[in-house]
């Protein structure tokens, strides 16, 4: 319905939003029916412009610093009021949505956007409930005003844009930016703060389930394979990015997928390919003269995206929930070419590698990245989104693994035979074969070889995988150079881990420099 006075459109349909976006010049229709929108100079998240309001109710529980920057309550009130005044005479789009597919752990949220395509994104990525807010919880508010220009000296921001979370008032303000991923990550951060207090582990992971009800989780930073590997034609998708793990099961925090599109192919990623159709939002994807998307074109950004609802996936778990996971996979993209394609972790090693979050920024989702690929340590495989101290999440992970008996694996989707530029990246079929072996239970109680420097147990055989690939030293022509790189990586792990206050059992579970 539309409010004729203020031109406010409540809970608009997909078709209406696509029509509005085209009429208002916000995007273009592609040959496959998707809507392409461009986000201007900000083609990724803006971590330097993300703040949390520092107020008494939550201040003691947040790890303040460069990731979670403090914002004054008074400054927030002023900025919120200025944005509301800015939007007062604008045509707006509003939906009542939910975040969290669990009937106990959802958060209701009213999303107000200046752009039609942002509203379509929100309706694709959040959950459209059959009945809004059944438990009558206090409702969160998101306001997204991309055309509002922040003034640092007036507003207390760092630039002309800001993303601000206010836990006390249940408000999220997005001003001055068009990149839609900020909306979903803001509510992910909200749930990452709220869920641990309810005994639930929030996770930056994808999840799927087999025909027998066996759940697998895939942790990893953007570009390491979460979406690709969980979109398995033989299994049912729960979700591709954000989940909660409660006693008794896992649930999707979202209602859609936000898949990277760079180099997307029908052959390697058929599930994602088929999901891109009418109703999908394509961010910063370039088209040819016939409006056919060119997924190889990175002229606007490496971080091209497709946002679509889970309903676009044929093989999915319709309630967005699953049993507790038998297998947990940590996806790492090792640019040094040192890590094996798969390692079997003890629970102490799981805690160590969860806290370390070693991986790479692949076609980084953050603006201002100087290099397309660089190694990084990202706590909990998602440091930018976790407001509480890392130990809170690591303890919850250990607790869940122990109580259910999940087996954790470290899977390298990065390089072998040498570092990036010399070695070659593991291809998707090889990694898929490893994942198949993991989910089938093949790698439980198998013969392993121990890699001393890395302190990892590696299986000697995996069905469908060349055995020479399993021990990384075999893929390097210069064995001495491999040993040198392995020592360098072990030293980097040790240096990064020094900041954590953990038990000796966990500290000793890491690589040995």
Curated annotation (Swiss-Prot):
| Record key words, sorted | ATP-binding, Cytoplasm, Decarboxylase, Gluconeogenesis, Lyase, Manganese, Metal-binding, Nucleotide-binding
GO CC, any one term = cytosol
Report whether Metal-binding shows up as a keyword of the record. Answer: yes
Q: What is its EC number?
A: 4.1.1.49
Q: Where does this polypeptide localize?
A: Cytoplasm
Cofactors required: Mn(2+)
Q: Which GO terms describe its molecular function?
A: ATP binding; metal ion binding; phosphoenolpyruvate carboxykinase (ATP) activity
Q: Which Gene3D superfamilies match?
A: 3.90.228.20, Phosphoenolpyruvate Carboxykinase, domain 1 (3.40.449.10), Phosphoenolpyruvate Carboxykinase, domain 2 (2.170.8.10)
Catalytic activity line of the entry: oxaloacetate + ATP = phosphoenolpyruvate + ADP + CO2
The answer to whether the entry has keyword Lyase is: yes
Binding positions for substrate per the UniProt entry: 45, 179, 185, 305
Biological process according to GO: gluconeogenesis
Q: Where does Mn(2+) bind?
A: 185, 204, 241
| Residues given in the record as ATP binding sites | 185, 204, 220-228, 269, 305, 431
Q: Which PROSITE patterns match?
A: PEPCK_ATP (PS00532)
Instruction: Give the cofactor binding note.
Output: Binds 1 Mn(2+) ion per subunit.
Q: In which pathway does it act?
A: Carbohydrate biosynthesis; gluconeogenesis
Describe, as the record does, how this protein assembles with itself and its partners: Monomer.
Query: HAMAP family under this entry?
Result: PEPCK_ATP (MF_00453)
Name the protein family.
Belongs to the phosphoenolpyruvate carboxykinase (ATP) family.
The protein's role, per its UniProt record: Involved in the gluconeogenesis. Catalyzes the conversion of oxaloacetate (OAA) to phosphoenolpyruvate (PEP) through direct phosphoryl transfer between the nucleoside triphosphate and OAA.
Q: What is this protein called?
A: Phosphoenolpyruvate carboxykinase (ATP)
Species the sequence originates in: Shewanella oneidensis (strain ATCC 700550 / JCM 31522 / CIP 106686 / LMG 19005 / NCIMB 14063 / MR-1)
């Amino acid at each position: 319905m539309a409010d004729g006075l203020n031109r406010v459109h409540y809970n608009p349909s997909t078709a209406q939003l696509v029509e509005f976006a085209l009429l208002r010049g916000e995007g273009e229709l592609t040959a496959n029916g998707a809507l392409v929108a461009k986000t201007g100079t900000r083609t990724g998240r803006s971590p330097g412009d993300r703040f949390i309001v520092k107020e008494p109710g939550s201040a003691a529980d947040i790890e303040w610093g460069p990731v979670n920057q403090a914002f004054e309550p008074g400054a927030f009130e002023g900025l919120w009021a200025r944005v509301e005044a800015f939007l007062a005479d604008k045509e707006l789009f509003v939906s009542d949505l939910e975040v969290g597919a669990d009937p106990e752990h959802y958060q209701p949220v009213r999303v107000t956007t200046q752009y039609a395509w942002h509203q379509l994104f929100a309706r694709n990525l959040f959950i459209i409930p059959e009945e809004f807010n059944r438990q009558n919880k206090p409702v969160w508010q998101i306001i997204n005003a991309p055309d509002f220009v922040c003034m640092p000296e007036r507003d207390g921001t760092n630039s002309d844009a800001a993303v601000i979370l206010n836990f006390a008032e249940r408000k999220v303000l997005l001003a001055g930016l068009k990149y839609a991923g900020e909306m979903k990550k803001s509510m992910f951060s909200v749930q990452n703060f709220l869920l641990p207090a309810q005994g639930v582990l929030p996770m930056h992971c994808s999840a799927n389930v087999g025909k027998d009800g066996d759940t697998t989780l895939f942790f990893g930073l953007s570009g390491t394979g979460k979406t690709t590997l969980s979109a398995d034609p033989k299994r049912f998708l729960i979700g591709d990015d954000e989940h909660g793990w409660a006693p008794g099961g896992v649930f999707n925090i979202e209602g859609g997928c936000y898949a990277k599109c760079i180099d997307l192919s029908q052959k390697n990623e058929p599930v994602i390919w088929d999901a891109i159709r009418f109703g999908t939002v394509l961010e910063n994807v370039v088209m040819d003269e016939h409006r056919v998307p060119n997924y190889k074109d990175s002229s606007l950004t490496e971080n091209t995206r497709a946002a679509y609802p889970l309903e676009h996936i044929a093989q999915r778990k319709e309630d967005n929930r699953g049993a507790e996971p038998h297998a947990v996979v940590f996806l790492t993209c090792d640019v040094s070419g040192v890590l094996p394609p798969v390692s079997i972790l003890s629970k102490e090693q799981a805690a160590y590698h969860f806290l370390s979050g070693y991986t790479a920024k692949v076609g980084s989702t953050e603006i201002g990245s100087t290099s397309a690929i660089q190694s990084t340590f990202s706590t909990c495989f998602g440091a930018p989104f976790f407001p509480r101290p890392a130990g809170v999440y690591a303890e919850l992970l250990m607790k869940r693994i122990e109580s259910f008996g999940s087996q954790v694996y470290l899977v390298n989707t990065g390089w072998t035979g040498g570092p990036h530029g010399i070695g070659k990246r593991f291809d998707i079929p090889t990694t898929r074969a490893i994942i198949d072996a993991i989910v089938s239970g093949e790698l439980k109680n198998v013969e392993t070889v121990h890699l001393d420097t890395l302190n990892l147990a590696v299986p000697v055989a995996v069905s469908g995988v060349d055995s020479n690939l399993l021990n990384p030293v075999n893929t390097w022509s210069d064995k001495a150079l491999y040993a040198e790189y392995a020592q360098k990586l072990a030293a980097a792990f040790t240096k990064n881990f020094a900041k954590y206050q953990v038990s000796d059992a966990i500290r000793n579970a890491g690589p040995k420099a």
